[in-house]
């Protein structure tokens, strides 16, 4: 197999047994693909598909004026260039966006001509605001902060049938309902009430009988009945008896009210007997099609058609009239020969529409329309036109109603139609078909839908949501344009004068800036970034709300398999509403989640991969990824465990149609990073995957000894590392940049063939952690495309590294690890294992105030020399200064209001020019409790103001950096060009040239003796060579010109002033780097949900040690394992111990300078001979140099990968422990560090990967002496941010009361809280060294008195003197 640059340096021993079928797809694809579809920036205007921006414009344009004499048509759009790149936008606090220009065509028609002749056409490009661009990592920079737009899981448009589970009516009767949900437009609900009448609701308003809707669609009563019912025919004979046309199947289950006979008079069913299937067969056999029935047989039935008197032609009875004996006698008297009745029965053909018609008050279409108008717009007087227009706009107008392609597909599928495409609006057939389906479900035929099925929920990603917002903006523009279009013809306006882009820009800005789904990116570490971008929210606009979401929505559903992770979801009120995409899941064109499967043909597994959505999946039989196969890929077991119709069953291999592609297909990225996940309880795995996202990047990242093999994918896809765009040779590398000379094969014509990667150094992340990239390549290394060149935060050698491998013992230790506390050795602090760097950004803003402008200066009133010692002459702190709480970072003074001066003061001021008292000190100071180093300062000055010394220095430094970059690029291009020329010229004959004899053959020495520009003056005998020389000269000149232009562009950006908010003159941003060591109170965790707080840091000499004198780093409580059932941590420790032991052995081989062959054979034994190795590592292809490099990287331990659900088995761990010459029990004898005594029994010791979580005691600890008070209650504020106090609540008061501690209680409720006079007096007393207190009246009593007065009760406190 081919190893990448970093894999060669450090191979992970993989325990996976299952074959590798499919690489993990690019993890950010869901974000990037969605937004790429939205902008279609890389496609030319005529090739754009009807999605995204293009679709939004197409749906709103053309806009036609009210008179119809002018129209505005959309032609195409183009995206401009971004003013600043991503990093500049973050620095300046602006949005990373590009201008959108739309080409529109204004057509004016001739009023006079009959056939709308075109009078005038004007075409113009119109600016339509800015569209935010997505960065390469799937984020947006909005106002300088990185944000993520998370995808939303919402109910798919279409039609859904459901019932109320018997909760509405006390009888527990199931009331069925149908709901048509469009993508945009009014909802249409049909529902049964307890009396089995069918009602309709529009937009959840009050209900109307469903037949009103049908009548509004222009159906008559008779048409309605014929659509929903079959009829029974009765013919009146000469003898006054009725003859019934028999449909035998309809009689089943009825009780015969008379003898039923065949043609010969034989009785088939006796009176009073129930008619069974056997009777029906006999009737069919006897060919009975007519049957004499008594007239009572017709009573209670309903007429299917209007009954008309044949003689007079008058209407006797309307259809749907119930037949009574009175009605029947009139029908007979009128001489009606044939009566048709509705066929209904109790079981499977209820009379619902017929009953509903009886309560329907309307008779004509207009009445029905008026009724609907009254329901939608109560209180408005209806007219015929307004009623018709309202109804037409509800479901039948393309502007107001759209099912969308998805909705139409789901709608047609649910109603069992052949086609999946159709109109976006509803048709009469659609509405009738939905009612028919609902009635058939009520009749017991068919099933209701499961709304939690992932076939009924679809994912809306960034692109789609941005398109919707954009359309909302365009619709607002449309209204304004329509008004102005009528003026366009008379005043000769251009398209630019018609369109005001503000509403579009506002809608887009609002969505990206403040939508519930546009979130501040979680940038703790690379994993949290990736997880945030792969989030699926059920909340948000158009989704659920926390309060309404029940248990079912939150629960794991069988269709989540391979689509949504069943493990990773937050604990707390959002559980189950925020999910994470499974590793291999993707969305299809309709927005439904799909999962990949391998095709199985007649028991043989192929390598063909197909994606199935939840809609299709249930019909297939799908085997697990772990099903055993023989060498030919055939399923070997007699019965295979499969999933079929959302259930797990066993089937024969020949029945299997698909098979999972991987064992980690089920879980998300975070869960797939937990080794031995299969041995952990689900609740703990949930905590484990959530806590990995909170790990803070440590000073020196360390790869996990026990991983899962996913670490490399996460690091590469997260975007925090520098990944080679093209293969090549490392030309130069330092801490800040890597220069790659690209392989000739990958260089395109006219391209420099140089890739320069500038590394990010010590930048602040959204969570104030530190982002820093370190190169891992050396000069001269050969890299290929996709290799990792530099590690980012929490990445080690191209692998995700969130924590540190710690030597851990499971034992109680003096109660210091009671209840999940953690005992840590001082060595961990000394070695800076969990030291993290946090970067804080502090901002000082100088504004223009009413009293004059604020000034940033080092001249601050009443501040001593020492306080100003760290500021330069501009009043800004030096880079590198060590500052602590209260130190001045930026000196700033603000004008004070003019006070009335005494004559003496005026005189003094006139003499000495004393102005210091006019300003007050409002400098930026370091917040209390913070200590750090200034690592960067940025100064932004308003355009038009003169820049101070400091900003000019910063600007110069930045320009030098750019110049250095460009020179480097030119140097490499130049070198490469001359190398190619040298290769072509050596040995060729010169025709003429300075410093060279004619007819001489060129050698390396001659060329070295020439100045570089003299090479271009050479003329050779061959014309082809002369052409090559000229072309090289042109290319270099062209390159130099391009680089100079880039430099000028950068210079222009830096030297122009900044676009600051109104009233702001200058902004200074100071970045502090704060080093946080680990300390008691910090939260730590493993990857299995085993979290705890550090209780104490013990000296190394007191920690338990083994017989070699090796102390443990951390002591954990063994009681934390059994009840929590996360045994994965114990297995991880054992395997970690083996990994470390093997590293020690390799180190010994290197120290003893053993032959390379010995090292190679030991590595062969580790990788290819120990355990059940599925895929062997190809160490034979490694050179001796590479083997030594590999061995040196394995000294700290041989990294292992135990993939989820396919991990290391117990016997393999034991084999590795034996290979490392360790006890295969995984237990060790330990000695007490304080006494030297051996502990009474052996202890489990091993290596576990521990994380330091972003819940640091420094951020939480807080103390208050005096501070600010709440205005009304006069009690101290709460919380660290407000510098608040601790609340002494009701229950605490009870505790003091229980102890009878009256004086303490008095102190708590008065001087320490809201007794204003008492606390001031107390403070004075303490200053004077007198510790007495005089409690007075608490302010809360006064508040109570005032509140009672507000009720109109006067209450006065009478105090005794």
Curated annotation (Swiss-Prot):
Annotated Gene3D superfamilies: 2.40.50.100, 2.40.50.150, 3.90.1100.10, 6.10.140.1670, DNA-directed RNA polymerase, beta subunit, external 1 domain, DNA-directed RNA polymerase, subunit 2, domain 6, RNA polymerase alpha subunit dimerisation domain, RNA polymerase Rpb2, domain 2
Q: Which Pfam families match?
A: RNA_pol_Rpb2_1, RNA_pol_Rpb2_2, RNA_pol_Rpb2_3, RNA_pol_Rpb2_45, RNA_pol_Rpb2_6, RNA_pol_Rpb2_7
Q: What class of enzyme is it?
A: transferase
Question: MF terms per GO, please?
Answer: DNA binding; DNA-directed RNA polymerase activity; ribonucleoside binding
Give me any GO biological process, just one: DNA-templated transcription
Reported EC number(s) for this entry are 2.7.7.6
User: Can you state which reaction this protein catalyses?
Assistant: RNA(n) + a ribonucleoside 5'-triphosphate = RNA(n+1) + diphosphate
One GO cellular component term? DNA-directed RNA polymerase complex
InterPro entries found in the cross-reference section: DNA-dir_RNA_pol_bsu_ext_1_sf, DNA-dir_RNA_pol_bsu_external_1, DNA-dir_RNA_pol_su2, DNA-dir_RNAP_su2_dom, DNA-dir_RNAP_su2_hyb_sf, RNA_pol_bsu_bac, RNA_pol_bsu_CS, RNA_pol_bsu_protrusion
Question: Which PANTHER family does this one have?
Answer: DNA-DIRECTED RNA POLYMERASE I SUBUNIT 2
| Assembly, per entry | The RNAP catalytic core consists of 2 alpha, 1 beta, 1 beta' and 1 omega subunit. When a sigma factor is associated with the core the holoenzyme is formed, which can initiate transcription.
Q: Which HAMAP family match?
A: RNApol_bact_RpoB
What is the annotated role of this protein in its UniProt record? DNA-dependent RNA polymerase catalyzes the transcription of DNA into RNA using the four ribonucleoside triphosphates as substrates.
The text of the family note is: Belongs to the RNA polymerase beta chain family.
What name does the UniProt record give this protein?
A: DNA-directed RNA polymerase subunit beta
The scientific name of the source species is Cellvibrio japonicus (strain Ueda107) (Pseudomonas fluorescens subsp. cellulosa)
